[in-house]
Amino acid sequence: MRLTQMPSEFQKALPVLEKIKEAGFEAYFVGGSVRDALLHSPIHDVDIATSSYPEETKQIFPRTADIGIEHGTVLVLDGDEEYEVTTFRTEDVYVDYRRPSAVSFVRSLEEDLKRRDFTVNAFALDETGEIVDLFHGLEDLEKQVLRAVGVASERFNEDALRIMRGFRFQASLGFALEPETFKAMKTLTPLLEKISVERTFVEFDKLLLAPFWRRGLASMIESQAYDYLPDMASSQDKLNRLFDLETDFTFESSEQAWAALLWALEIENAQSFLKSWKTSRQFAKQVQDLLIILALRENGELSKRDCYRFDIDLLLQAENLRQAQGKEVNPQAITEKYQSLTIHDKKDIQINGGILIKEYGYQPGPDLGEILTEIEFAIVDGELENNREAIHAYLREKK
């Protein structure tokens, strides 16, 4: 099969392929970018595979960088563009179900492609637009099926993260898992405990943010993979609560998706749960803020102080999630209340601790902090104008 129209992302990278070919080596576009081109989906990363070894690749191009040369990858700088060019390779026995004990460079495209996870990710595309399909990936693409390359159990034993990737690809593509592939995934889910939490988080996060997240999550639940994820053992019934969200609902952000997950799981200690997933402090704080906003909304409308406390984006994401839960919402009222605030941060106040110390004799300490907080909330509540004259008058009354 030949692509009738080469996507612009590939056209930009064609000079790289052509230079490698001119040097006497093979070179192809490979991986998910080829699949996305066939599906007419946006292309994000253009990856190139070649029969040239890393040192040979570096001799072909004047500007390169070593970003993973031990795995055969050289970063080629072509004008303003950067391309990862990786040597065809085979992999030895995998250690800890995560990484190969050794990587061997080869000259064979077939040897390289047969180590990949799913047939729809095992395409190669040459400079003429010809598709190399050694594992019937085109047929699977047509049938919308996710099938492991070769023997499924071998692929998942090599890298157990591929189990989560399978659920994630199902969520992003909307494809069905081929029965033997899914059977192997279900059998080998205990291996997920061998995978670093950080890698698992990335795949689970992508699953939740994907357009067909319900399909991926349903397969994950059916496989009982959740039993081997941090703080999620025996959580099937609670995970199913996510399916109570509106049928066509998709998450706006990772923070919103994980807030929904914690809501479904009825997690009491969000901080502990997110720590077990090794998320960043900033991410954990925003997820917890969303949960707080949801709890506040359960008790009625948000106050001015509530709107001041949280970023408008989080306030609206919480309202969006409430709508998906089938609850009454009023994003316009929240937006208007937020916009009516005369300050949105302490830094907006027309006075500071230094002025209070210099002009009013306050000393650094709790009393200073208390009066600043009092001024802050008086402004937020609309009881005090945010200008020096009004604040000075307020302070004189306090004295």
Swiss-Prot record:
List the catalytic activities from the record: a tRNA precursor + 2 CTP + ATP = a tRNA with a 3' CCA end + 3 diphosphate; a tRNA with a 3' CCA end + 2 CTP + ATP = a tRNA with a 3' CCACCA end + 3 diphosphate
| Binding, CTP | G32, R35, R116, D159, R162, R165, R168
CDD domains from the entry? NT_ClassII-CCAase (cd05398)
Chain sites annotated for binding Mg(2+): D45, D47
Q: Determine if Lipid biosynthesis is one of this entry's keywords.
A: no
The keyword Metal-binding belongs to this UniProt entry's keyword annotation: yes
Instruction: Tell me which SUPFAM superfamilies the record gives.
Output: Nucleotidyltransferase, Poly A polymerase C-terminal region-like
Q: Which residues bind ATP?
A: G32, R35, R116, D159, R162, R165, R168
Q: Which GO terms describe its molecular function?
A: ATP binding; CCA tRNA nucleotidyltransferase activity; magnesium ion binding; tRNA binding
Sorted keywords for this record are: ATP-binding, Magnesium, Metal-binding, Nucleotide-binding, Nucleotidyltransferase, RNA repair, RNA-binding, Transferase, tRNA processing
* EC number assigned by the record: 2.7.7.72
Short name of one Pfam family for this protein? tRNA_NucTran2_2
Q: Which GO terms describe its biological process?
A: RNA repair; tRNA 3'-terminal CCA addition
Swiss-Prot/TrEMBL cofactor(s): Mg(2+)
Group of enzyme by EC = transferase
Into which family does the record put it?
Belongs to the tRNA nucleotidyltransferase/poly(A) polymerase family. Bacterial CCA-adding enzyme type 3 subfamily.
- Quaternary form? Homodimer.
The record's function comment reads: Catalyzes the addition and repair of the essential 3'-terminal CCA sequence in tRNAs without using a nucleic acid template. Adds these three nucleotides in the order of C, C, and A to the tRNA nucleotide-73, using CTP and ATP as substrates and producing inorganic pyrophosphate. tRNA 3'-terminal CCA addition is required both for tRNA processing and repair. Also involved in tRNA surveillance by mediating tandem CCA addition to generate a CCACCA at the 3' terminus of unstable tRNAs. While stable tRNAs receive only 3'-terminal CCA, unstable tRNAs are marked with CCACCA and rapidly degraded.
Designated name of the protein: CCA-adding enzyme
Gene that specifies this protein: cca
